[in-house]
A protein has these predicted regions:
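N-terminal secretory signal peptides
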Residues: 1-20, 34-35, 43-44
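Sec-dependent signal peptide hydrophobic core
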Residues: 25-33
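Signal peptide processing junction and immediate N-terminal pro/mature segment
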Residues: 39-49
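Short, glycine-/small- and polar/acidic-enriched structural segments
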Residues: 48-211, 215-218, 233-244, 251-264
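Extracytoplasmic/secreted proteins, especially bacterial periplasmic and envelope-associated proteins
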Residues: 75, 98, 102, 194-201, ...
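Ligand-binding pocket segment of bilobal, Venus flytrap-like solute-binding proteins
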Residues: 112-114, 218-254, 273, 309-327
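Short glycine- and hydrophobic/aromatic-rich loop-to-beta-strand nucleating segment
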Residues: 152-153, 269-272, 276-277
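Secondary-structure end/capping motifs
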Residues: 279-344
Length: 344
């Protein structure tokens, strides 16, 4: 199934039945009910010994991004095993399209049970909007992995414009480039995903029609920098460490963080197939508790450097430590002289 955001896909995303979408949104949000009114301490005590998990197995997907760190840390620090999930596989996916395809398959068909995922995707998958033959695959969101933390970056050729939150100066530059017979492109990671939404909003706010004035292309996160380097795009929206790497390689700079567009917006989620949750509710709780404990570890300032080192490992993100650590600590150098420290 192609992930190119063609006109038909845009129409599907816009015109999908509101009733159907709301119905499946309720399904996707159903994971909240797993914990009821239990306090975090009560949950931890209940599952510290593994409880009575129905299975110790789960296959979880992730994309090479720093907001997947809770899954890496849960695996590295033994948090999955602590809660009885001793056979968890955390598996790198090549793209969000691959994540979608493997969730549709499920682990019984050599796919995955759950994933670190763009927040809109469980809803879109549950509603059958982005699945083969529009077949709904019910999903459950178990946890919010992070808020904000993404960036929109632009290529080095636009350095003199110092493009920021206001994309208006970008419009004239793109028009001039097109007048010279060259293509202009904006890269996102998945049609209808958060990066797609932030990019479209930012462009449109500056008078750039994302459907008519610029080509919108889908590029996997880990391939953004390489594609910018060879001139395949003019701007992209993605999570770290790829924006920082772009700057470190002197290929471009950060125009804005997505938190500047919407403060503390929901970003990635931890989601499972709803049939896994229904069959293994205790295991689903255990997985969520492990990830929540990993999140608490990641949030502590004294652990940031260790988490960055974990993320840099080849089996996880596989990017240099220097491309990860500063922004993980909340220190954002935009590559234009603008610096924000202690960014949440």
């Amino acid at each position: 199934m192609t992930d190119k955001p063609n006109n038909d896909q845009r129409s599907d995303l816009t015109l999908a039945s509101r009733r159907s979408f709301l119905k499946h949104s309720i399904i996707a949000a159903s994971g909240v009910a797993l914990f009821g009114g239990m306090s975090l301490g009560m949950r931890s005590a209940a599952w510290a010994a593994g409880g009575d998990v129905e299975t110790s197995k789960a296959k979880l997907g992730f994309i090479a991004l720093t907001d997947a760190a809770p899954l890496f840390v849960a695996a590295e620090k033994g948090f999955f095993a602590k809660y009885g999930m001793t056979e968890v596989e955390v598996l790198k996916q090549s793209s969000w399209g691959t994540t979608r395809d493997n969730l549709v398959l499920g682990s019984a068909k050599n796919g995955i049970d759950g994933a670190h995922i763009l927040t809109p995707m469980p809803y879109l998958i549950s509603a059958g909007i982005v699945t083969p033959n529009n077949q709904p695959v019910p999903m459950s969101i178990l946890a919010r992995l992070n808020l904000a933390g993404q960036c929109i970056s632009v290529g080095e050729e636009y350095r003199d414009l110092k493009i920021g939150l206001d994309s208006t100066p970008f419009k004239a530059a793109l028009e001039a480039k097109k007048a010279g017979g060259k293509k202009v492109s904006a890269a996102v990671t998945f049609p209808g995903g958060t990066h797609d939404l932030w990019m479209r909003y930012w462009l449109a706010a500056g008078g750039i029609d994302p459907n008519a004035d610029i080509n919108t292309i889908v590029v996997p996160p880990a391939q953004m920098v390489a594609n910018m380097k060879v001139g395949s795009m003019d701007t992209f929206c993605v999570c770290e460490p790829w924006n920082a790497q772009l700057i470190n390689q002197k290929i471009g700079y950060t125009a804005n963080t997505t938190g500047e567009l919407w403060h503390n917006h929901p970003e990635k989620a931890f989601a499972l197939r709803s049939d896994y949750v229904a069959t293994n509710p205790n295991a689903a709780r255990a997985l969520t508790m492990a990830i929540m404990e990993a999140q608490q570890f990641c949030e502590k300032a004294e652990n940031k450097e260790e988490v960055a080192k974990i993320c840099s490992q080849r089996k996880w993100i596989g990017a240099p430590y220097k491309d990860i650590v500063d922004r993980m600590k909340g220190n954002f150098a935009y590559g234009t002289g603008k610096v924000i420290e202690n960014h949440p």
